[in-house]
């Protein structure tokens, strides 16, 4: 739904006066082709709606007197509601469990086994944690079917999915997605107070999501968790994605309630995107900005030149059109690299709040490019000339054939480095040339609030090669 008179779509809430049947969440994404169905589902639309709603709230605000209000971390301009404070207490208790679970002695090939002990503690404590955090009318909202479960079964699924995989001892964007969905489920159950547009959303981001990310970083560092579904050097980040979305919004141009989310520009005094490559800038900005907070964590756990271990983020730091351009690109990339990737969404489960049912206005995906990472029921023919490849998404989207082969001697230089460049960062453009465009939010009557990457122009000519490989210009490219 759209907020009255505002260019923003808002995640709908349940009407308490109407019946609702809750469902035990179930796995629906079992093969690559199921991702296409997911991208047409009500769950997908609701996830993107909630993400865009939160994103908009983090842009600086134009005040009636002409001043600009920004939303840095730990700002006193944001007051937390009672539900947000309850969620903060929940996170604090999980942190206490972390402190009370020391590392196991010995050598571990992957993550330390104490992670599984901590994970078991969180699971055991979940019923009481949710009961203390959420009002009974939210947690135990009944189904209209007398034999149906309460809302607790759906809330528990998304909450437990937020803390990494006990079996694989890893953490990635799929777990981050589960926490976002947990908060979205509370929203749909009317668990957050009604307020002016953006007010409560802002408290959710600053008061719950950022503390959650900080807690997860502590878990990752303590137990040395593996990244789940990482693209390696070609990925954006080994573990997280949403801090780059909200953090770039924090530095975007100021907007009023009637403005559309901007696609270019920055705050007049915003730090330059190139600041991510400067350690002193990162240390300063990580205290006030979510984007730089995530960059700071990368610097904490990775060694070597930033451009070498985080090439995607290094490339993005060369964007000249401002933080709003980066924000738009991040949302597009989240859609393509998280929600459209089988390895990420295969573990997501669907109930009534985030439903597998098809959205009536869904537009079928134009390409199967995002499903190629998953198993298929029908074998696909591989051309005899095709060489073995590590898989979709592991190669930089802008890489050419000549770039795919690493330098023969050093082994540590950037893939595009030449013998003259040595170990120095490249001096050519760092802007990726293309990314998959998998936008799916429908146009129609709500065109002003559709996904920010959606184009009103007709599609261009089909690319050469595989007709299924539909790509568009990178969101931050000029």
UniProtKB/Swiss-Prot annotation:
Catalytic activity: [protein]-peptidylproline (omega=180) = [protein]-peptidylproline (omega=0)
Subcellular location: Cytoplasm; Nucleus
GO cellular component: cytoplasm; nucleus; protein phosphatase type 2A complex
A biological process term (GO) from this entry: mitotic spindle organization
Family annotation (InterPro entries): Phstyr_phstse_ac, PTPA_C_lid, PTPA_sf
Pfam family, one: PTPA
UniProt keyword terms in alphabetical order: Cytoplasm, Isomerase, Nucleus, Rotamase
GO MF entries: peptidyl-prolyl cis-trans isomerase activity; protein tyrosine phosphatase activator activity
Compositional bias of kind Low complexity: 396-419
Similarity annotation: Belongs to the PTPA-type PPIase family.
Protein name: Serine/threonine-protein phosphatase 2A activator 1
Name of the gene encoding the protein in the UniProt record: rrd1
